[in-house]
Amino acid sequence: MDGVHDLAGVQGFGKVPHTVNADIGPTFHAEWEHLPYSLMFAGVAELGAFSVDEVRYVVERMEPRHYMMTPYYERYVIGVATLMVEKGILTQDELESLAGGPFPLSRPSESEGRPAPVETTTFEVGQRVRVRDEYVPGHIRMPAYCRGRVGTISHRTTEKWPFPDAIGHGRNDAGEEPTYHVKFAAEELFGSDTDGGSVVVDLFEGYLEPAA
């Protein structure tokens, strides 16, 4: 799903300052910021009510202006709260009573997701691949900037994981696939105005096809 959550490579936001090996500071800057991860793993591991990919997708479903005005960790509080209402763990009235006022949630899903591909190709390190040029209305873990682009496999995981486009919607046909590190020339992704170098993207097998 294209949206405000996938801004990498989008023009108009200015240059991103970057210093190699810079100290980015602590993970959490306020006492409450660990809360969304605690809530998320309570819902995933303790209750078994939803998956991590469902959490990612529910954050993507936030109303765009709400998303842009909300701090990073607060988005995940909203996301987990939305899932708890959708799964029947809480009602929105109970949530707003606990919050002491209105508690805007993510928008309802407009997609049922899609099943994992039945047939995929296993790739080897050094093999050139093309990212499938697919526009998906629901959850997907493929950055828009690499759709249709050609890169080289630099690593294949030994583990397999549920296909995000399915499990992110709570489907039971997610299957399991390995992921690959795919190395792209910066020019392949962003054109000749880049400062050179390369970009490595972690992609599921179902997103890839052999490059011609």
From Swiss-Prot:
It is an enzyme of class 4 (lyase). Industrial production of acrylamide is now being developed using some of these enzymes. InterPro entries: CN_hydtase_beta-like_N, CN_hydtase_beta_C, CN_hydtase_beta_dom_C, Elect_transpt_acc-like_dom_sf, Nitrile_hydratase_bsu. Keywords: Lyase. GO terms for molecular function: nitrile hydratase activity; transition metal ion binding. It comes from the Bacteria. It catalyses: an aliphatic primary amide = an aliphatic nitrile + H2O. Its EC number is 4.2.1.84. NCBIfam families: nitrile_beta. NHase catalyzes the hydration of various nitrile compounds to the corresponding amides. Belongs to the nitrile hydratase subunit beta family. Heterodimer of an alpha and a beta chain. This is Nitrile hydratase subunit beta.
